[in-house]
């Protein structure tokens, strides 16, 4: 690998300082000053430098979704798919592929390094350090970016000083880390800042609209992810648990607030749209379009919002980076390049939709029934049937925020891409707890981990506990978002030997502790697909599960994109070799 070529390209435009902020992401060459020895000694310096980092961060946001989903099992290519995407899906990695440009990641890294190296965090105003928030933000973005690079490329060249001179670009002096080695380096760096605030600016827009801290990955969640990849499941579980219990508004709540009424589904979509399904009143749609990322964040990240961290995208290239993702999945003329896979449809249809009986419970027990042939309903929110003069076809409108028509062509845009949201934290907490159950040979913890899917988070803690007091009542299990009143189900969506035996096609008496752990793990893996599909996590989720279960776990899923009866044997054999999972560096 030619490491020098990777980072040497950063010498053009190492860092940007904005001289004004009419549009926070407009960093054109006529408005940029480069000063490699400049000390960031004012709050304005720190804010505008951080904005420069966010601009660079935008440029890798699409990559997060595309690399994470096109290589996974829930997305498939079609006749329109361009060569670069097709090669990704088939794991034929050409160094000239537009999606493999590692320099864009190092641009983010180098900008963060510059801010961290030059910011004066000792400056105080009213006895408060005024630039610490931006310092922590740079730490968080740098750590998250390094983690993504290690996951995608297998190893990452690691450096912490800004490269501003050609002599510094000889990176043979720098170490290369895989994700576990990287975790051992990053965790001690991040731990001292776990309780620090991220920036929450309020004076950059003429109308005073705030730019919230949700533009930055929380240190606590990055730590949770690093612990999870490292295999430190005790600390991973505690970190995720503490984030959820310390942030009560990060809980998914039942919309009704009563155990005797029907829970509603809750589907977070792109650009601030939310679709809900209330079976008592019929389907309703709540949709709010946000033309600017600043105003949009107020709505989507409010007290009841789903998103935790987002990357705002623009509607026009004149304003900044426009996401390619919506147009890859959506078209009215059957020109889209990516589809949901047949395996996604199979998985969704295999679920049981549970409908609680109406009225008051009898004898303290509420009845329920299964709705036949319904399956998980989340896929129906995301997939739209279309028809033109020639074809009937399906598209995915999960990412479409706005549509712009020019003549016969249409352009689809999205207001933001999501890095962290509540359901994802729930599911990673469940994964960590189940892995901890295996380490400690504690079946009760495995049942608790499954409970996060089935019952919600508050059931994990007894009444009167320090955590219970902070939790909202009647939190919603993740699986309920697509499958109804699953908390009532005592026959199918449960951890019982008979259910586990049927799940794996074995005799009840042969079910053992390992089967229980694997059953819960498989349910979590399936739920990650059902809940977070198309959002960028899928392939690396499969890699993480395969670290515990073997290469076949990943290979067998990805090779069955076209359905379990249509396994791609050549692709399966290729993916049994873990070296083929990772991207080449240019």
Functional labels for PLM-detected ranges:
Residues 58, 148, 152-155, 229, ...:
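Alpha-helix C-terminal capping/termination sites
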Residues 179-182, 196-207, 251-299, 359-365, ...:
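Surface-exposed intrinsically disordered loops and tails
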Residues 21-69, 237, 554, 560-586:
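Membrane-proximal, proline-rich intrinsically disordered regions
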Residues 249-459, 521, 545-586:
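Elongated scaffold/linker segments in the mid-to-C-terminal portions of large proteins
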Residues 1-19:
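Sec-dependent bacterial lipoprotein signal peptides
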């Amino acid at each position: 690998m030619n490491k020098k070529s990777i980072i040497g390209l950063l010498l053009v435009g190492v860092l940007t300082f904005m001289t004004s902020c009419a549009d926070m992401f407009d960093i054109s060459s006529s408005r940029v000053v480069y000063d490699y020895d400049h000390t960031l000694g004012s709050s304005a310096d720190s804010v505008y430098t951080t904005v420069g980092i966010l601009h660079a961060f935008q440029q890798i946001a699409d990559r997060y979704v595309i690399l994470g989903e096109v290589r996974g099992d829930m997305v498939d290519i079609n006749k329109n798919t361009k060569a670069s995407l097709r090669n990704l899906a088939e794991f034929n990695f050409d160094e000239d592929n537009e999606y493999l440009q590692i320099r864009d990641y190092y641009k983010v890294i180098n900008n963060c390094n510059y801010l961290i190296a030059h910011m004066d965090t000792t400056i105080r105003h009213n006895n408060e350090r005024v630039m610490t928030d931006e310092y922590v933000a740079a730490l968080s973005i740098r750590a998250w970016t390094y983690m993504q690079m290690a996951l995608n490329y297998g190893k990452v060249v690691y450096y912490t000083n800004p490269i501003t001179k050609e002599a510094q670009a000889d990176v043979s002096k720098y170490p290369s880390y895989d994700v576990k080695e990287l975790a051992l380096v990053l965790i001690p760096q991040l731990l001292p800042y776990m309780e620090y605030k991220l920036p929450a600016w309020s004076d950059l827009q003429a109308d005073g609209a705030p730019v919230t801290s949700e533009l930055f990955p929380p240190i606590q969640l990055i730590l949770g992810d690093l612990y999870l990849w490292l295999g430190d499941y005790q600390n991973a579980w505690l970190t995720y648990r503490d984030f959820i219990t310390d942030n009560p508004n990060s809980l998914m709540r039942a919309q009704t607030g009563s155990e005797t009424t029907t829970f509603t589904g809750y589907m977070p979509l792109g650009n601030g749209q939310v679709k809900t399904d209330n079976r008592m009143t019929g389907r309703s749609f709540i949709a709010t379009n946000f033309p600017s990322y600043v105003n949009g964040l107020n709505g989507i990240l409010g007290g009841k919002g789903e998103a935790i961290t987002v990357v705002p995208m623009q509607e026009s290239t004149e304003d900044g980076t426009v996401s390619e993702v919506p147009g890859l999945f959506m078209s009215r003329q059957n020109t889209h390049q990516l589809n949901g896979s047949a395996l996604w449809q199979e998985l969704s249809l295999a679920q049981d939709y549970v409908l609680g009986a109406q009225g008051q419970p009898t004898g303290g027990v509420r009845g329920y029934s299964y709705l036949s042939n319904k399956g998980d309903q989340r896929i129906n929110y995301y997939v739209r049937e279309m028809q033109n003069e020639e074809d009937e076809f399906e598209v995915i409108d999960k990412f479409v925020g706005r549509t712009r028509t020019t003549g016969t062509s249409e352009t689809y845009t999205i207001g933001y891409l999501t890095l962290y949201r509540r359901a994802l934290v729930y599911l990673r907490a469940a994964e960590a707890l189940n892995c901890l159950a295996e380490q400690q040979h504690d079946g009760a913890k495995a049942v608790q981990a499954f409970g996060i899917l089935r019952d919600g988070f508050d059931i994990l803690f007894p009444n009167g506990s320090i955590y219970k007091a902070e939790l909202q009542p009647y939190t919603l299990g993740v699986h309920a978002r697509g499958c109804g009143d699953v908390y009532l189900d005592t026959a199918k969506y449960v951890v019982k030997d008979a259910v586990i035996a049927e799940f794996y096609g074995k005799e009840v008496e042969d079910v053992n502790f390992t089967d229980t752990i694997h059953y819960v793990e498989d349910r979590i893996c399936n739920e990650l697909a059902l809940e977070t599909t198309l959002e960028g996590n899928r392939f690396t989720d499969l890699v993480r599960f395969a670290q515990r279960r073997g290469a076949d776990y990943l290979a067998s899923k990805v090779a069955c994109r076209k359905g379990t009866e249509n396994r791609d044997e050549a692709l399966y054999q290729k993916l049994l070799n873990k070296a083929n999972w990772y991207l080449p560096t240019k």
